[in-house]
């Protein structure tokens, strides 16, 4: 085929004759070939014809799917039987205690996985050989619809499913959709189905947002130059993963421009000269010649400012030509990476506990024969993940299989697993070895995982060759582990859980019958008292017994319900007609010091607010604001009344003045009238009237204010003179006031309220047990303190008399119940009683269940009986379900929680048929072991008794625990069925990378720091790995100059270097994902020691770029999606183009600024000419979001995210937007500078002034030019004024253009803004020209 695309269509070669089945792949290449040779129109026509052809034949053939087309391969049954047999053997090994729970699980999963794969191959084989024209087969394999995994579910088996936690369920779905699923299988399937739906929904959103960010970061990458003339490039090799080639070299080279000529490695002839693009045929030729690495030009190394040049980008993949200038390659790149995002899975199932790391390559025997090991083979025994014994090859070696007439040798690499022994006979298809993947990158990262081992039967635990060891961690917790592993036996028996406080009534080795009492619990009273048995409500659970330990009865007071203040309340009437209001409702509990009732009395009620003063009254110091202050000594309360009105209105509504004397009934504020004569006091703030006080009393004007000043706010006793001729006949309070008429004194009336020392209390009668005195005490409380001003319009209560419960006890938490009882003599009258009750709940009788026997409770007291503290009120007996021998009662001080009965159900007897028994008493036997010659036991057991001719065995189960397991039980413990015995700790390969698919791509492109990232070596040197006793590991690196650096290792990290190994700078020391920021920093530091800052920045950035490109590629490859490297490179270029200034030197740049690397370099070059200090900087890696927000264009950044922040910053810095990208232009509504619009803004007046441009005079008149005129600034449209157009001088683009337009170049700078009139004049010039 001719590859050269310069032919005109007529000369193009006709397609070569193709004798193949045209499936999807063939169709692709056919269309591609037509496209490169004949262009779009003719290809479209051809594709149309192909479509018609396809439909015509499909119709004629009648290709459709009916149920009969779903043919299940006949070998399915045989495969399932084999798998089930293998699993049965595994289960047997597990019940014998030969493998652990983890190994069993692993084996089951692997067996089913293998079966499922084998069946899939059978499906294909079956279709191919029996019915190649089957429509299902044709569809799936031509690539028209469906794929192998779907066909497998239709006619193979669905296989293993994961549960919602991502753990694999070890019950596979053995059926397919053709046969139909069982109910269980259907329900298992539904987890996965739901996950699929949710995943798809989330994926579209995620992928859309990724595309948006990508477009934003790379939208201004446009091909603006033909050749940037760079000398740098990147080496390209095939992309591999272990031994597998993911992307061959030929594919990666297609459409790239080579930097150096490609030379045939053997003949030395030049395959391709430099700066030439690699076409398909040349790519194949290069691959055939065996070239391993080609240095090509790449957008990553392109030196074009703010864009990529044509040569560095290479072919436009749509046309197989070099890309055109003005092509918006950034947007193409963004869409190429974003679009397949929907096809990536979000999270591959985290296959719970399943070691699906790299599946090791398996070697199977091609024929029957015998295995021979080489003489000097070094191997060590090894336990595989299925718990089988195998050998590990310590050095690379080979195996030989000798058959009857043929021999074959297999190469075995180091660390491979050998599943056969020397001289063993093997059958065809048997697995011989698992070969470890070779290569340095075989660092399988492992993580610790745990799995519970639960007991399958109740019984007694016995350790067999298991030595527990205690470990203390820093928090002081003790865990018991089995450092060397061993067996935990559970010997069968009926285990009874005892209720709390139960005491066994039997001893070990007692023999009891069914329904005998095993243990009993006593119900004991703590305080003693009078027994009261409440009436039982039908259907209620456990009975209660109440014991009254103390009570008090108000024997003279009557209680009745009365409606007060709109609700029903209990009123207590005592002697002397005192009436109390019950504050605590009947049936509630009250505690010591709580108010039970309050006296209804209005002796202490005032009419208005006022000031309260104590005279002789004493109160307790600590008063609670809520309850008031308790009176300790009586006396008199003095009350100086005053009215207070809270107003909070505008001052203009006030109708009186401050200090004015008013009569009762005067309107002081609009709609507010005073109730007494007195002086007005007004409080106001900011022209808002807060409150008005009216102070009643007699007002006397005084001539000499000083004479009364000393007596202000004191009391005037009756008959005492205040001023000559001014006295009073009752107690008054003196206050000096300022009135509109002048200074005056106000004598305010004082009301006296007497307070008695002891309030009267209703009589009470009480029964008290020892030390449980309980009574009601009357307490007087004052709500206000001495001198407090009380604001009120209605009036307040100055004193409250309350009945308070007093419990004289050392147990403060005791509460009393309030009860209302009918009187014994008179049914009509109710009395109030307070009782302290001890309530004991009697257990319900329960019938026996799995874990406990039946219980029976007997009550030992009767109603009204007086009992002492500590007396037994009731007994509960726990009975055995069936007869047996008692075991497991612990002697010593610890309480017995469980009792074991060894019943007949737990024993089996075996006849030895006269043969001598080989077992001894107490011996533990596993299923299949011999008791006597030729007599085996069906299940594992312990030998109890050996008699003539028969052996009595006790059923048991062994559980194997692996070394390092955490034990949850002790030797001789009793366990119920389902109790956890141990926690197996095992290592599993971390599945692939932490995450795959979209989240991983996002992590890479956003340059996120991964969790649990690995530690990298800072400099090259030799490792020292030290393993300490406490399981911690230290890694040190001795560098060339002898310095030793410590590398701390976090928890869960494993070193992947060996002692004495040499490492290079930037190599990983521990396992875990790489952090791109670390790579950049370490390589930059490393290169800075020997090279300049620019060179170091380029080299370190190139490392990171390489890492990111390969990272993104491998994710897409793992899902089988092909993306050309150049697209990823364009985006990565945008992420790695900036540096952070550390020190501005003599430049105008500020520390901390993010600036393009090439821009800083230009300024530094200028500095080196002028002799100024250059700027120092560090390269940075920005995620795509960060990079978008840091673009030169603030319009683009603001339209992406954080609009306000971006715009305010741009405004403060006075930024200008040069409108270089597509987005800015679209927002403003101009023609975009790509495609046909590319030339309309060609260089003319658009470039930023060169750094060398600094000396030119600018005239900047802040004039504005509008779009319509700005668009006409174009060299190409201008007719020269005189005959010849001056040759275009690229060194001074703007200047030359301006002179062509007849403008004085010196007068107008690149940044000058022109006003409309000038612009119109220019316009007229141009149009006149044309």
From Swiss-Prot:
Tagged with keyword Transferase: yes
GO biological process terms, semicolon-separated: DNA-templated transcription
Cofactor(s) needed: Zn(2+)
Keywords: DNA-directed RNA polymerase, Metal-binding, Nucleotidyltransferase, Transcription, Transferase, Zinc
GO CC annotations, alphabetized: DNA-directed RNA polymerase complex
Reactions listed under catalytic activity: RNA(n) + a ribonucleoside 5'-triphosphate = RNA(n+1) + diphosphate
EC numbers on record: 2.7.7.6
Keyword Transferase assigned: yes
Protein name, UniProt field: DNA-directed RNA polymerase subunit beta'
Native organism: Acaryochloris marina (strain MBIC 11017)
């Amino acid at each position: 085929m001719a590859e050269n695309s310069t032919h005109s269509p007529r000369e193009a070669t006709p397609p070569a004759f193709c004798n193949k089945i045209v499936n999807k792949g063939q169709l692709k290449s056919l269309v591609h070939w037509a496209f490169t040779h004949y262009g779009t129109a003719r290809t479209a026509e051809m594709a149309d014809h192909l479509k018609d052809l396809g439909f015509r034949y499909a119709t004629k053939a009648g290709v459709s799917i009916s149920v009969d087309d779903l043919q299940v391969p006949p070998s399915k049954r045989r495969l399932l039987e084999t798998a089930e047999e293998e699993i049965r053997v595994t289960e047997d090994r597990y019940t014998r205690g030969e493998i652990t729970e983890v190994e069993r699980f692993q084996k089951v999963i692997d067996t089913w996985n293998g079966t499922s794969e084998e069946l899939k191959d059978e499906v294909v084989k079956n279709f191919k050989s029996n019915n190649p024209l089957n429509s299902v087969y044709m569809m799936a394999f031509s690539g028209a619809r469906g794929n192998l995994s779907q066909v497998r579910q239709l006619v193979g088996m669905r296989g293993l499913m994961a549960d919602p936690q991502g753990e694999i369920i070890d019950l596979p779905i053995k059926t397919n959709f053709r046969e139909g699923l069982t109910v269980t299988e259907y329900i298992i399937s539904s987890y996965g189905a739901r996950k699929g739906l949710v995943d798809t929904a989330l994926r579209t959103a995620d992928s859309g947002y990724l595309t948006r960010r990508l477009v934003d970061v790379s939208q201004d990458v446009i091909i603006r130059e033909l050749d940037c003339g760079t000398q740098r490039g990147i080496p390209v090799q095939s992309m591999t993963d272990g031994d597998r080639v993911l992307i061959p070299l030929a594919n990666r080279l297609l459409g790239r421009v080579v930097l150096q000529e490609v030379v045939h490695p053997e003949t030395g002839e030049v395959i391709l000269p430099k700066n030439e693009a690699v076409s398909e045929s040349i790519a194949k030729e290069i691959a055939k010649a065996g070239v391993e690495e080609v240095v090509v030009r790449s957008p990553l190394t392109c030196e074009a400012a703010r864009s990529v040049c044509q040569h560095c980008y290479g072919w436009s993949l749509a046309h197989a030509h070099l890309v055109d200038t003005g092509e918006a390659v950034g947007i193409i790149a963004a869409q190429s990476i974003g679009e397949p995002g929907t096809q990536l899975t979000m999270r591959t199932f985290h296959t719970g506990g399943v070691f699906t790391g790299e599946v090791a390559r398996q070697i199977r025997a091609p024929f029957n024969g015998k295995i021979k090991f080489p003489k000097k083979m070094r191997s060590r025994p090894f336990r595989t993940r299925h718990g089988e014994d195998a050998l590990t090859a310590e050095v690379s070696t080979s195996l030989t299989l000798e058959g009857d007439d043929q021999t074959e040798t297999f190469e075995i690499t180091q660390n491979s697993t050998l599943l056969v022994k020397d001289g063993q006979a093997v059958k065809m298809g048997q697995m011989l070895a698992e070969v470890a993947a070779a290569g340095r990158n075989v660092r399988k990262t492992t993580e610790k995982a745990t799995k519970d081992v639960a007991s399958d039967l109740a019984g007694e635990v016995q350790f067999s060759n298991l030595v527990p060891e205690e470990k203390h961690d820093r928090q002081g917790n003790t865990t018991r582990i089995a450092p060397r592993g061993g067996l935990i036996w559970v010997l069968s028996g009926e285990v009874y859980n005892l209720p709390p406080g139960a005491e066994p009534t039997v001893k070990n080795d007692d023999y009891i019958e069914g329904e005998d009492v095993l243990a009993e619990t006593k119900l004991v009273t703590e305080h003693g008292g009078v027994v009261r048995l409440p009436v039982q409500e039908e259907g209620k659970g456990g009975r209660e017994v109440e014991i009254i330990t103390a009570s008090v009865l108000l024997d003279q007071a009557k209680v009745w319900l009365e409606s007060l203040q709109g609700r029903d309340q209990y009123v207590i009437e005592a002697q002397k007609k005192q009436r109390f209001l019950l504050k605590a409702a009947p049936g509630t509990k009250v505690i010591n010091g709580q108010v039970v009732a309050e006296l209804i009395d209005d002796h202490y009620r005032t009419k208005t607010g006022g000031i309260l003063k104590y005279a002789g009254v004493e109160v307790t110091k600590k008063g609670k604001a809520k309850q008031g202050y308790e009176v300790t000594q009586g006396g008199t309360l003095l009350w100086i009344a005053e009215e207070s009105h809270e107003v909070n209105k505008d001052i203009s509504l006030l109708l009186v003045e401050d200090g004015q004397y008013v009569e009762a009934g005067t309107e002081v504020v609009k709609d507010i009238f005073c109730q007494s004569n007195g002086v007005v006091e007004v409080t106001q703030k900011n022209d808002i009237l807060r409150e008005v006080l009216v102070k009643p009393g007699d007002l006397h004007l005084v001539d000499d204010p000083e004479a009364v000043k000393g007596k202000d706010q004191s009391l005037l006793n009756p008959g005492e003179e205040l001023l000559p001729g001014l006295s009073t006949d009752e107690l008054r309070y003196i206050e000096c006031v300022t009135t509109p008429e002048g200074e005056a004194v106000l004598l305010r009336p004082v009301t006296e309220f007497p307070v008695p020392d002891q309030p009267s209390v209703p009589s009470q009668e009480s029964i008290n047990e020892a030390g449980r005195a309980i009574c009601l005490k009357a307490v007087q409380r004052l709500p206000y303190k001495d001198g407090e001003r009380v604001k009120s319009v209605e009036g307040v209560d100055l004193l409250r008399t309350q009945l308070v419960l007093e419990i004289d006890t050392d147990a403060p938490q005791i509460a009393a119940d309030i009860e209302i009882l009918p009187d014994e003599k008179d049914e009509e009258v109710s009395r109030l009683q307070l009782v302290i009750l001890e309530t004991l709940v009697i257990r319900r009788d329960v019938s026996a269940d799995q874990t406990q026997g039946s219980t029976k409770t007997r009550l030992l007291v009767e109603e009204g009986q007086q009992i002492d503290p500590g007396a037994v009120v009731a007994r509960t007996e726990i009975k055995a379900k069936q007869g047996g021998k008692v075991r497991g009662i612990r002697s010593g001080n610890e309480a017995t929680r469980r009792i074991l009965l060894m019943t007949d159900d737990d024993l089996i007897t075996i006849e030895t048929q006269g043969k001598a028994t080989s077992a001894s008493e107490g011996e533990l036997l596993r299923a299949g072991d011999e008791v006597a010659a030729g007599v085996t036991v069906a299940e594992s057991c312990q030998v109890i008794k050996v008699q003539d001719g028969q052996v009595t065995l006790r059923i048991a189960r062994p559980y194997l625990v692996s070394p390092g397991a955490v034990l949850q039980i002790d030797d001789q413990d009793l366990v119920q069925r389902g109790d956890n015995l141990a926690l197996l700790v095992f290592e599993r390969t971390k599945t692939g990378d932490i995450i795959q698919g979209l989240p991983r791509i996002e992590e890479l492109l956003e340059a996120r720091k991964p969790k649990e990232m690995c530690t990298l070596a800072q400099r090259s040197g030799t490792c020292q790995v030290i393993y300490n006793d406490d399981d911690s590991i230290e890694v040190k690196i001795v560098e060339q100059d002898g310095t030793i650096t410590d590398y701390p290792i976090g928890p869960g990290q494993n070193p992947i270097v060996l002692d004495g190994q040499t490492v290079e700078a930037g190599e990983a020391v521990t396992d875990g994902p790489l952090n791109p920021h670390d790579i950049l920093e370490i390589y930059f530091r490393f290169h800075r020691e020997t090279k300049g800052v620019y060179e170091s920045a380029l080299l370190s950035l190139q490392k990171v770029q390489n890492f990111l490109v390969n990272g993104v590629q491998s994710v897409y490859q793992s899902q089988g999606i092909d993306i050309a490297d150049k697209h990823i490179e364009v985006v990565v270029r945008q992420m790695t183009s900036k540096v952070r200034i550390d020190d501005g030197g003599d430049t105008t740049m500020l520390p901390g600024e993010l600036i393009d690397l090439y821009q800083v370099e230009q300024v530094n070059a200028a500095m080196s000419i002028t002799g100024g200090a250059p700027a120092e900087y560090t390269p940075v890696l920005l995620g795509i979001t960060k990079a978008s927000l840091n673009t030169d264009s603030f319009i683009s950044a603001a339209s992406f995210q954080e609009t306000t922040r971006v715009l305010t910053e741009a405004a403060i810095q006075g930024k200008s937007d040069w409108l270089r990208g597509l987005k800015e232009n679209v927002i403003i509504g101009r023609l975009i500078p790509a495609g046909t619009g590319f030339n309309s803004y060609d260089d003319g007046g658009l470039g930023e002034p060169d750094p060398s441009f600094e000396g030119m005079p600018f005239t900047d008149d802040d004039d504005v030019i509008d779009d319509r005129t700005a668009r006409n600034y174009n060299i190409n449209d201008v007719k020269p004024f005189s005959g010849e157009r001056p040759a275009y001088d690229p060194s001074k683009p703007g200047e030359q253009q301006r002179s062509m337009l007849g403008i004085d170049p010196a007068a107008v700078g690149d940044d000058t803004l022109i006003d409309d009139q000038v612009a119109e004049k220019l316009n007229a010039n141009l149009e006149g020209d044309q």
